[in-house]
Regions:
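ATP-dependent adenylation/nucleotidyltransferase module used to activate substrates
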Residues: 1-117, 224-226
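ATP/NTP-dependent adenylation/nucleotidyl-transfer catalytic domains that generate, transfer
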Residues: 121-123, 127-226
Length: 226
């Protein structure tokens, strides 16, 4: 069966991802986007679970109108628990694309047994000292806030660049949620990675519970001096 193995470069996967693919799986075609993730944030703001424009632009666009084999599994999350081995995409933008999921019933244990049995190379981030359970976009909004914080703390330079991108968006879009409710990029980023309602955030800020030095708070958390 002829197939084309593709990696969509989201520009925000963990460092070393592309060299790893080139060294170990040279047959994989690396597709680069027209806009990077940071450029998208600077133009559209932070993504969210309900507003995943980053997935549409950076991950799914290559599969429009095609039959795609993907590695998603039911036991990865509650959202994927109802996935079928094959399902067609009803979104107009995907133009009838079909998603074939050959591993949909596999467990995590079966995945690792297969990897070790066949001695398949995999990224170092699954092993100590990282111990990641997933390899994907750093700070993905589909992950928990706790996972987002862990990933940004592991890769602090990504976080700093994201602060700069949202700052640019806020300056050019002052009428939006991020532009209206936050004073600077560090403040917006702090809210983005924490489990706080906007009401609670504003109350805590008014009460000076944050001491309102979000740049210092973010940098201290990330362990950097800037």
């Amino acid at each position: 069966m002829k197939f084309e193995a593709v990696y969509s470069n989201t520009t925000i996967d963990p460092p070393g991802t592309i060299p790893f693919i080139r060294d170990n799986y040279p047959e994989v075609k690396i597709v680069n986007p027209k806009e990077s993730f940071l450029q998208l944030v600077a133009r559209k703001g932070f993504p969210s679970r309900q507003r995943r424009f980053c997935c549409e632009v950076l991950k799914e666009s290559y599969g429009v109108g095609k039959r795609n084999l993907e590695g998603m599994r039911r036991d990865e999350s509650n959202n994927r628990a109802g996935y079928e081995p094959e399902q067609c995409d009803s979104r107009k933008s995907m133009k009838g694309a079909c998603h074939v999921l050959p591993l949909v019933f596999w467990t995590e244990r079966q995945i690792w047994e297969y990897i070790h049995k066949h001695n398949l190379p995999y990224m170092k981030y699954y092993d100590p000292p990282y111990n990641f359970t997933r390899h994907g976009c750093v700070g993905c909004p589909l992950a928990t806030k706790q996972q987002m914080r862990i990933e940004f703390k592991t890769f602090p330079r990504y976080a700093i660049n994201l602060v700069k991108a949202i700052k640019k968006f806020m300056e050019t879009h002052p009428e939006t949620f991020w532009g209206k409710n936050f004073d600077n990029g560090h403040e917006a980023f702090y809210y983005y990675i924490n489990d706080l309602s906007l009401q609670d955030f504003k109350f805590m800020k008014t009460a000076s519970m944050f001491k309102n030095d979000f740049r210092r708070m973010v940098n201290n958390y990330l362990g950097i001096n800037e």
